[in-house]
């Protein structure tokens, strides 16, 4: 059963055409890796599905009650936001907070009160991963999830994704 339907989309930036009459159906258990060189529309496709950009024409439909979590290649690192507030998106749900604390510790970010502005690039990427993974989602949209990660974190992420039961669309330049 398709949970995402992309039908006849077109997207261009000025003269640069990325998609012209593109269509794709995504099943609830699909694991799709999108590999390619810069400027070919990989990140744009995820942005279109996530709803952060609009196609010039065509439709993208996500089935009812499908929860989507999106890890952008460039993420907002609000400078004075504390780590726990960032990864939980300010929720007060105790279950989400407990899960966030576990995942922060597992990914080497135990100081939940630290400001994002004080984190290194790799730590910010790990914080963005925690934010993406803590709440249940049926679909993970992951744009360059291994950028700024060391080999141990990449290995952890690979294991996590191998055990993930939902749909994954992953964009990368690497063939790992």
Model-predicted regions and their roles:
Residues 1-176:
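ABC ATP-binding cassette signature C-motif
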